[in-house]
Amino acid sequence: DVALIGGLNYYKAVDEGKQLLGSFDNNIWSGKVGIQFGAHTVQVGLQRNNGDDDFDYLRQSDSIYLDNSIQYSDFNSPKEKSWQVRYDLDMEPFGVPGLSFMTRYAQGWDADYSNANEVYMRRDDNGDPLTNQKRWERDIEAKYVVQTGSLKDMSFRVRQMTTRATDYESDLDEVRLIVEYPLEVL
């Protein structure tokens, strides 16, 4: 079995009201294409922030659905462009239903705060706006979803993340254990 995968996301944000923090007019888009063949899925994605400010959203809320918004990096800095490649492996065809693996790599470049609103402005030690900022992130994940019993659909993930960036950004390494248990409320 072969299936094509694709998606497109677009957001536009504008300020309203008294504009006490200055003006804000921004848009960002992302797109991905991929192919699924048997147990394997390969995807590539592109993303671009066309605005002069970070594309703002409620942090830690999963309220932004952009293809390159991944574990740590959102690749949403002013004028930033980014790409991603992702590979998923479903172990069910190999006799282990519920087990899957994922790895992805994303890279961003050209982040430029030269025209950013003062609220979003990021500067170097000399007070100059940051320009030509770059970063990358790599995620590796193993996931298991319980197949039967009272814990059916409960999932356990172990994900290792590494991100590196130019000056004034974070270089991080972390491991997360993510446990999800779906509840039906109604």
What does each of the following model-derived ranges do?
Residues 2, 25-29, 79-83, 134-138, ...:
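Residues that define the transmembrane beta-barrel architecture of outer-membrane proteins
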Residues 1-56:
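Long, internal scaffold/assembly segments composed of regular secondary structure
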Residues 1-5, 92-99, 147-156, 168-170, ...:
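Short loop/turn motifs that connect adjacent beta-strands in outer-membrane beta-barrel proteins
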Residues 85, 140-144, 171-186:
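Outer-membrane beta-barrel "beta-signal"
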Residues 6-8, 33, 42-44, 87, ...:
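Membrane-embedded beta-strand positions of outer-membrane beta-barrel proteins
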Residues 13-26, 54-60, 112-121, 167-173:
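Outer-membrane beta-barrel translocator domains and adjoining extracellular loop/strand segments
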